[in-house]
Amino acid sequence: MSKKILYGKEARKALLQGVDAIANTVKVTLGPKGRNVILEKAYESPAIVNDGVSIAKEIELKNPYQNMGAKLVYEVASKTNDKAGDGTTTATVLAQSMIHRGFDAIDAGANPVLVKEGIELASLTVAKKLLAKSKKVDDQEDIQNVASVSSGSQEIGKIIAQAMQKVGKDGVINVDESKGFETELEVVEGLQYDKGYASPYFVSDRESMTVHLENALVLVTDHKISTVQEIVPILEEVVKASRPLLIVAEAVENEVLGVLVANKLRGTFNVVVTNAPGFGDNQKEMLKDIAVLTKANFVFKDLNMKLADLKMDDLGNINKVIIKKDNTTLISNSKSPELEKRIQLLKTQIKNSTSDYETKNLQERLAKLSGGVALIKVGAATDTELKDKKLRIEDALNATKAAITEGIVVGGGKALVEVYQELKDTLVSDNKEVQQGIDLVVQSLLVPTYQIAYNAGFSGKDVVKQQLLQPSNFGFNAKEGKYVCLLKEGIIDPTKVTRQAVINAASISALMITTEAAVVSFKENKDNNFDLGTQE
């Protein structure tokens, strides 16, 4: 296929149009009075969402140059979501500002490599300043405030705080759908282990890249499944039972995986494979934990148990399975005496353990088995509302976990304003062009505050001016339209979310400003002219 190349200012202009297409769409959602964006969905009703990365993911532009710019900004949102679980809109707004300022500097004759050096220096300094300002999450109130700010709902904040109180800060919390209109919290028996699906082709929900199984059978073994013939007899029984099957094995050969995936895609049976968690003796014990929870017979190779001899009675049962890329959650609705015995055995082993390493592993297993799983059952009047509510709760959960990891900073964009005030005259370089890179990052720190105020119906410029005059921790409450002590009002952000937003925005901006050419594929129309399309 032929290629078309744009150079210099022309290339940067096209990329910038793509950046603006995404950023201008996403930034309307920022802050407590941010608006929603409606997304067309093929074969289903439109989605109305407030989540930056979900919006950015859906945007495809006809012009390939503009689309490259858009996809680079989507990467900012996606990376921030992967690392911190929230803050995607803030990252997008920061990236747009940095890229605009960076391109202006390059077009005015600055050396892009030196400007890039300044951007990298400034972003690392901002990240350090944010960590220095971070306050540890000490109590339930902080957890509730973080979740409330992220979701834009006091009710959701309260439910997430209750969930963490019941299963612990490191406990397993999942979001599910309720059959009613109310959003409720339920704690059930279950555990989560750190292995996801063995192949992405098992995924049933492409949007969230998750597998959901209901009323599933469970095969638990420390065998390496090398041939399909080993498990054909039990698979035939599973097909007759018309129930989904979860296979948890030490390993499964690619050839076997291929056959299982092909049969799943054809609809022959519904099966998902995950590798066993842990390694060595600890792996065997974790597999036993899974077997006890699911009431499965553990197919143990040291006892010369063979997969070919498996009967239906050897398989376990589980009410619900949620499998993601990196973890699997098993949820049971019934209490088991065997599970209680297993928990007591672990407690005894911890008491008698003389090894720190062994004690740590035992404590982790005990926490997984005894902590249970908190289910936030989301209720709504319509499917559209349900999807939006689930996204908000998932974002709030991620934000809360990020806050527990790195602590919190004052919210409403104030933390970035304070860092701006500390660095605007102190972070200096002898090189003029490096300084331009520093300045464009530092100046961009004011943009989230501007956008939050603008979305709430206030003058962004006036609010930024007033923010600069406020004492530490005091700032603009966009929801109420007044200046308050933000910490006292519970307007806080996870440090990790804010820090990752700055780092990822600066990373893409630094790379984009060094771009001097853009290469795309093109189709020729009937007149043999280039068909590159226009922005759509």
From Swiss-Prot:
Keyword list, A-Z: ATP-binding, Chaperone, Cytoplasm, Isomerase, Nucleotide-binding
Any one Gene Ontology molecular-function term assigned to this protein's record: isomerase activity
A Pfam family reported for this protein in Swiss-Prot or TrEMBL: Cpn60_TCP1
A GO-annotated cellular component: cytoplasm
Signal peptide: none
EC numbers on record: 5.6.1.7
GO biological process per UniProt: protein refolding
Main location group: cytoplasm
Record flagged with keyword Nucleotide-binding: yes
Superkingdom per UniProt: Bacteria
Database matches in InterPro entries: Cpn60/GroEL, Cpn60/GroEL/TCP-1, GroEL-like_apical_dom_sf, GROEL-like_equatorial_sf, TCP-1-like_intermed_sf
CDD domains assigned to the protein according to its UniProt record, in alphabetical order: GroEL
Catalytic activity: ATP + H2O + a folded polypeptide = ADP + phosphate + an unfolded polypeptide
Protein localization: Cytoplasm
Sites where the protein binds ATP: T29, L30, G31, P32, D86, G87, T88, T89, T90, G412, D493
Family, as annotated: Belongs to the chaperonin (HSP60) family.
Protein task: Together with its co-chaperonin GroES, plays an essential role in assisting protein folding. The GroEL-GroES system forms a nano-cage that allows encapsulation of the non-native substrate proteins and provides a physical environment optimized to promote and accelerate protein folding.
Subunit structure: Forms a cylinder of 14 subunits composed of two heptameric rings stacked back-to-back. Interacts with the co-chaperonin GroES.
Protein name from the UniProt record: Chaperonin GroEL
